Amino acid sequence: MTKPLDGINVLDFTHVQAGPACTQMMGFLGANVIKIERRGSGDMTRGWLQDKPNVDSLYFTMFNCNKRSIELDMKTPEGKELLEQMIKKADVMVENFGPGALDRMGFTWEYIQELNPRVILASVKGYAEGHANEHLKVYENVAQCSGGAAATTGFWDGPPTVSGAALGDSNSGMHLMIGILAALEMRHKTGRGQKVAVAMQDAVLNLVRIKLRDQQRLERTGILAEYPQAQPNFAFDRDGNPLSFDNITSVPRGGNAGGGGQPGWMLKCKGWETDADSYVYFTIAANMWPQICDMIDKPEWKDDPAYNTFEGRVDKLMDIFSFIETKFADKDKFEVTEWAAQYGIPCGPVMSMKELAHDPSLQKVGTVVEVVDEIRGNHLTVGAPFKFSGFQPEITRAPLLGEHTDEVLKELGLDDAKIKELHAKQVV
C-alpha cells in the first residue's frame, strides 16, 4: 500500500510529548522515523508513570509508535560523524531541545545546511524566536497559561484552570507537522529546505482565537452578552457578590458557556448524583429554536418575542437551560442525546475515559487502536485522527531503546566489524 509520506526520512531528536506527537503522526503516515536517543537512558518518559515493571511506560509507548530507535552518544567524535551521515540522508529533522541546545552541540542551522541543503529543521519551543521570553523553558501547563487558555477556562469564582487536553504539547506537535508538510511541498518548488518553528504559546493561542475575538468585542462594546456574567443574578464572586461587566476589562472565565456564538451549557441527566459524567452538552442554536420548543414542550415560546430571538432570550439563558434540564431527569445522557437527535438539535454526552477506551465504534473506525506488543503486552492507543479513502494507517508498537541501532548503521553502509567497534567504544 502506498503511504502519504513514503520515502520521507525523519530524524527524531524529540522527547516527552510535543515533538514525539509530531513525529509519531508522521510515522502513521508512512515516514521513516528514526528516534535518536541518548545512549544508556533514552527518552526520559520511558520510565515515567510506569504501570508495569521492567517495561517502557504507556507515556512513552503512546507517543512513539511507528518509529525506530537508535542509541547514540552525540558528544563523541564518532557519534557526531554518524549523525552527520544521517543528516545527509534526511528529509526532516525534528527537535524540542531547550533554546540553543542544538547550536551548543555544534549543529547550527548553517552547518546543517552545509551537510544537506534540502533538509527541513523543525523545532518546538516555548516562545517564538524574537519574543521577550524566548529564553524560557515551557511545559504543557505553562504553555496553556502563556497562550490564554488557562485565564479563560474554569468558573468565574475559581482560579484559572488548565485543560485536560494537551493544548501545549500535542497541539504544538500537530501544528509543527502542518508546518513540516508545507515546507516539504515548498521544497518541491525551490529545491531547498528551511527552518520551521512552532512556539507553544502561539499554538495555544491559535486554539483560543475566539477569546481574542471576545477581547476585542469587550473593548468595543463593554459587554459579552452571552457570558454568564451578563445574566441577572447568576454569576457571583467568591464573596457572594453578583458579577457584571461593569468592571470586567478582560475576557472572563465563562464556565461551560458556548464560545462559538451559539449558547450552550452542561446539563444534568439521570444518574448524575452518583456518576460524575452523567451530563450532556446542550446547544441553543438560533436556527433550531422552534425544534427546541417542541422538544421541551414549550410551543408558546416559538412566537414569544421575549424568547424567539437571541436578543430576546439572551438575558434568560440560564433560566432556559435550567428548565430544559428538568426534562432530562428521567433519561440518561445517551437517551437524551438520541431524543435531541430526533429534532436535529446539537447535543452530546459527556464521555468518560473508560467509556471511550471501550467504545466499539471508536475501535471499529480506527480511532482507538489495540497495539500488538509482544514485550509489554497489548495496549490501547489513539490512532490517526484523519481517515483516508485510499490509505489505512497501520499502527506498530513503540521501539525498545536502541532496538534498531545496528539496522540503521547498516543502512549507512557500516559493516559488522565497524558496528562492533562502535559498540565497544560506547558510541552506540
Swiss-Prot record:
Q: Which GO terms describe its molecular function?
A: formyl-CoA transferase activity
UniProt-reported outcome of changing residue 260 to A: 25-fold decrease of the catalytic effiency. Reduction of the affinity binding for both formyl-CoA and oxalate
The annotated active site, in chain numbering, is 169
- InterPro entries recorded: CoA-transferase_III_domain, CoA-Trfase_fam_III, CoA-Trfase_III_dom3_sf, CoA-Trfase_III_dom_1_sf, Formyl_CoA_transfer
Q: How is this protein activated or inhibited?
A: Inhibited by the sulfhydryl reagents N-ethylmaleimide and p-chloromercuribenzoate, and by chloride. Competitively inhibited by acetyl-CoA.
pH behavior = Optimum pH is between 6.5 and 7.5.
Which pathway does the UniProt entry assign to this protein? Metabolic intermediate degradation; oxalate degradation; CO(2) and formate from oxalate: step 1/2
Q: What is the effect of changing residue 48 to P?
A: Little change in the affinity binding and catalytic efficiency. It exhibits substrate inhibition with oxalate. It does not display major structural changes
Enzyme class, top EC level, equals transferase
Residues noted as binding substrate in the record, renumbered to the chain: 260-262
Cellular component, GO, one term: cytoplasm
Which keywords accompany this UniProt record? Answer: Cytoplasm, Transferase
Under catalytic activity, the entry for this protein gives: formyl-CoA + oxalate = oxalyl-CoA + formate; formyl-CoA + succinate = succinyl-CoA + formate
Against SUPFAM superfamilies, the record matches this protein to:
CoA-transferase family III (CaiB/BaiF)
Provide the effect of residue 169 to E: Loss of CoA-transferase activity
Cell compartment(s), UniProt: Cytoplasm
Q: What is its EC number?
A: 2.8.3.16
Family matches, as Gene3D superfamilies: Crotonobetainyl-coa:carnitine coa-transferase, domain 1 (3.40.50.10540), formyl-coa transferase, domain 3 (3.30.1540.10)
Query: Where is this protein chiefly located?
Result: cytoplasm
What the protein does comes down to: Involved in the catabolism of oxalate and in the adapatation to low pH via the induction of the oxalate-dependent acid tolerance response (ATR). Essential enzyme for the bacterium survival, as it relies on oxalic acid as its sole source of energy. Catalyzes the transfer of the CoA moiety from formyl-CoA to oxalate. It can also use succinate as acceptor.
Oligomeric and partner information: Homodimer.
Q: Which family does it belong to?
A: Belongs to the CoA-transferase III family. Frc subfamily.
What name is this protein filed under? Formyl-CoA:oxalate CoA-transferase
Question: Could you tell me which species this protein originates from?
Answer: Oxalobacter formigenes
Q: What is the gene name?
A: frc
